Amino acid sequence: AAEVSKVNNANLVLEALGQGARKYSDIATYTKLPASSLASVLNQLGSLDLISKDYPINAPDNLKKAQYVFRDNMVHFYYKYIYRNISHMGFMNPEKFYDLFIGPDLDTKHIPKQFEAICREFLIRSNKLNRISPPFFKIGRYYYDIPKLKKNGEFDVVTEDQTGFTFYEVKCRNQPMTPAQ
């Protein structure tokens, strides 16, 4: 029974991540797991390389800004679209299942986030091939907070080298871009 509970808790945490909960507090709210159980599940999933804890490049020790992310795109896709809807699959035409549960946000939310990871990987590979000058030694997200303007947010693809930070604008669209874009 304890092993089944552990599997259920792991699935619940992975489902929370799949539905967009990234911060510890958001995962806790979604899963309603006790803090000790949640911490244990997150550690176990991390040790299995299913998830990792991601910190902003400019705040590597800020636990409040840490986010949990999937390490594998297929696992991410499964828990985002399939896991919570799997009971419907046996009763539906595959195209209708896609239209109802996957299609509505695949191009507008899921793929653009994955594209950011692809861009980070491209930059890392380019850096290793000495195609970026000066070479960077860190890559990640950059968090900002402007209390006077009551504004905060993050940049998704940022590198750091000996001269400072370089910010990259990453957009994924399902349409051709014009030269002005």
Show which residues each predicted segment covers:
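Short conserved micro-motifs at the rims of enzyme active sites and ligand-binding pockets
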Residues: K80-I82, E169, P179
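Conserved catalytic cores of phosphodiester-cleaving nucleases, focusing on short active-site segments
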Residues: L123, F155-N174
